[in-house]
């Protein structure tokens, strides 16, 4: 995030109405995110129109300027991280005999469905994980393998690395 409200105020003619936004690539299929800086110079009607347009692309979220770098990193870089996760899941399934096209479809739908479930219910992601992890079952074995390899810290570190760039 290079230009925010104050930057545009200095660059644009006085009285120009503007809103800083950061869309991500899934807006191409109306399943994306448009991060909007909470501070703007739009009228209430203009902001309502902008929200309507951006919500048609997926989800529109207003954030304070200080949160723009982290929010933009999460939503803007996240699709690359999700794609790596989909590819890794598919590679694991292919290694065990699932055809690649099928593995990609399964991994992508699983990720999309899980995300939609969390958005629809508001359930804490940890509770969603716990609901799938039966005692002594296969899922908890897989979760333990991810934890041993530092999955969570690797994901968190990727956000830190980008925000501090």
Model-derived segments and spans:
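A generic short alpha-helical patch detector that favors 3-5-residue windows
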Residues: 77-81, 105-106, 131-134
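NAD(P)-dependent Rossmann-like dehydrogenase/reductase catalytic/cofactor-binding core
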Residues: 108-165
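ADP-ribose/adenylate-binding Rossmann-like module
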Residues: 1-4
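Internal alpha-helical scaffold of NAD(P)-dependent oxidoreductase catalytic cores
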Residues: 7, 11-17, 33-70, 82-120
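Short pre-catalytic strand/loop immediately N-terminal to key active-site residues, enriched for Gly-Thr
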Residues: 18, 68-73, 125-130
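Active-site capping/gating segments
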Residues: 20-35
């Amino acid at each position: 995030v290079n230009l925010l409200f104050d930057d545009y105020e200095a660059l644009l003619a006085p009285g120009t109405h503007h809103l800083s936004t950061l869309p991500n690539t899934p807006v191409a299929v109306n399943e994306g995110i448009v991060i909007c800086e909470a501070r703007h110079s739009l009228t209430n009607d203009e902001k309502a129109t902008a929200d309507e347009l951006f919500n048609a692309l997926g989800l529109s979220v207003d954030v304070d300027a200080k949160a723009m770098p982290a929010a933009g990193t999460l939503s803007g870089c996240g699709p690359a991280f999700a794609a790596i996760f989909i590819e890794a899941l598919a590679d694991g399934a292919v290694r065990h005999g699932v055809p690649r096209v099928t593995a990609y479809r399964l991994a992508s739908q699983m990720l999309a469905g899980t995300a939609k479930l969390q958005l629809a219910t508001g359930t804490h992601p940890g509770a969603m994980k716990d609901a799938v992890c039966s005692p002594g079952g296969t899922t908890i074995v897989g979760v333990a393998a991810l934890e041993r390899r530092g999955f969570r810290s690797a994901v968190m570190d990727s956000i830190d690395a980008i925000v501090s760039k």
